Amino acid sequence: MMPVPPSVVTNPPRQWDRCAPPTIYPDPDIVIVDPAFNDLLVGLNAIHRVWTGSIWAEGPAWSGQGQYLVFSDVQGNTQYRYLWETGEVSALRKPSYNSNGNSFDFQGRQLSTQDFFRRVVRWENDGSMTVIADSFEGQPLNSPNDLVPHPDGSIWFTDPPYGARLSEGHPDFAGGPTNPDGRLNPLVGQPDAGAMGGKSRVLPTNTYRWDPSGRLERVLTEEQVPDPNGLCFSPDYKTLYVVSTGKGPGDKVGGNNVIYAFDVQGSKLTNQRLFSDMIVDGVTCGPDGLRVDVYGNLWSGSNAPLGYAGVTVWNPQGKLLGRIRLPEVCANVAFGGPKRDHLFMTASQSLYVLQLLTQGAAPG
């Protein structure tokens, strides 16, 4: 049996495997910062690790039609499915072409980003695949990271450079920002990279909106949000939250580990403002993937040292309500379960879940 990481707070150290002793209530790894956080929690419940075995777990998304959760192991080049009825986890797509972010649109179709091909795709209900976007103004995208559907049929997604490396897809071809001297061969062991046609990163790290007509428009520039990552709408779709994360491969500057908020005016974004600097007790809880609940609270993965790794929870005004401490860095979260009242957390090598007294606000 693999050794399990201990809790960062309990004594004796908490064990996370399924055969471990039960956890006392209330769960000591759920940290109440504001009393309002209690209204979102099931007191007689605990965080559970339901699966482990990935390299870098990402992109959880819930299928209401299929009653399953899909998530990515980006570096493991596999997309997994967690069945609600049985709790079984199995490979859904392998290779996944280094799928990263996932969601489901309002027709129940799965949306995915693929680091390998640097594109956004949609899996139709008949099993076929449609390429949504792989270029902008004639230039290849960097590596679309996360995405979110809108009720008008549009798809909004971020395009940082994180997938442009050997571990998450393939590096640029010779001369590109992630392979300036050409010593790396992107074709070794992955001849499908030839489909890229020798292209390398050219575009800034922008955020885009794909319209159902097929038109792709830039809604945020790199200057507004450098290295954009996770994003999500408020429950009324009047606000878009976008994460700016740290320096990626080939970057000269990089992002700043904060969350921005924007007013949504049709296909345009206005009134940029800082939602949170993500500093908790002097520690940067680097944000990644985001989801909102029906009350407008923002749930963010936290890339931070032990004790602060996990999930941070913020009210719509940007006030910290509480934290969920995990023994691994958490990249992304999603609400799921038949009632959409379970928070799934993809954290490095594992998948965790916690039942709540709130529900996810949007499909996927």
Label the model's feature ranges.
Residues 78-80, 119-121, 205-208, 258-260, ...:
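A short loop-to-beta-strand structural motif that recurs across blades of beta-propeller domains
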Residues 304-364:
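C-terminal closing repeat unit and adjoining cap/tail of repeat-based domains
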Residues 7-46, 362-364:
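Blade/loop signatures of beta-propeller domains
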Residues 48-51, 90-94, 130-134, 218-221, ...:
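Beta-propeller fold detector
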Residues 46, 52-67, 95-114, 119, ...:
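Beta-rich, blade/repeat-based domains predominating
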Residues 83-87, 123-128, 210-214, 263-267, ...:
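Short loop/turn segments that connect beta-strands within beta-propeller blades
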Residues 74-75, 115-116, 164-204, 249-257, ...:
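Short, solvent-exposed loop/turn segments at conserved positions within beta-propeller repeat blades
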Residues 64-94:
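Beta-propeller domains
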